[in-house]
């Protein structure tokens, strides 16, 4: 007990909360009957066809289902497409015979964290909250206000779901842009890092992004495709997002190509060469 499997949450923090009686862990879902609120934060990967896989969300709903009771607040935090909370999760929970927004509360509040940044504290990161009804939203605001300084209510679960997607798509698209510029400027003999450092001195209308060997992490390479998939249901094309995905996906091969060029300049083959990678995380 007290061991953390999340890299940026030290075991000492878990042990401190355990000792203070503020945290307990259990695999017994019947305890939900004594709870005022349940927060679902499970993975939302893509399947082999690069389509959304919300099975972890639905299975969580099914685990909660037998224990849904009057007044319970259920909040989904997993990044997903608009409509997951008020359509898919709601349908599972209402099999209890209780009605969302009437008998129990349902809301969505996207997870926000900055892993790897020791100065980032969840309590200080504004929290977006959207409810199925105004009363649902108010209950979620009350819950999160006990731990987080600033709460940002929005009009619906869908607006909150779309907010998270916008945040991650914004990052993915801008990384793709600078990855493409990296290749263009390299061909011109221009140092893209020098250009970025000069551009970021502009105090308005610019935000620096940096090139790299593709996208990393659990979110940015995946989340944009949740929206591209859902958009097709509405007859909409997301060409910009999909093009950004293509650019970022191609970056590892660009790095290999540049490495090959550097070795060739030294009359060495990439096969059999020993290569030091700095900054690998």
Residue ranges of model-derived segments:
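Structural/interface elements that position substrates and couple domains in central-metabolism enzymes
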Residues: 1-281
